[in-house]
């Protein structure tokens, strides 16, 4: 398998930060990341603006891959 795919699959089960193309940020536990479409399924997700002042909580959130600009692990 491609190394890029391995990196994405390695994020599954971990807390991640996802920055979206519209400037919003999502933090949550990555349940599944499809390496071909970049679609992401998150549990216990918080959606906020870039400053973090407004936040909304979701139990489960699906993010379309075409909206993702960055995925990073949270420590």
What are these regions (language model features)?
Residues 1-75:
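Conserved RNA-binding domains used in RNP assembly and mRNA/RNA metabolism
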């Amino acid at each position: 398998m491609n190394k890029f795919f391995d990196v994405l699959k390695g994020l599954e089960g971990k807390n991640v930060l996802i920055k979206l193309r519209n400037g919003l940020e999502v933090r949550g536990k990555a349940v599944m990341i499809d390496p071909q479409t970049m679609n992401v399924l998150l549990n216990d997700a918080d959606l906020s603006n870039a400053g973090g002042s407004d936040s909304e909580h979701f139990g489960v959130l699906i993010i379309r891959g075409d909206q993702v600009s960055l995925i990073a692990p949270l420590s």
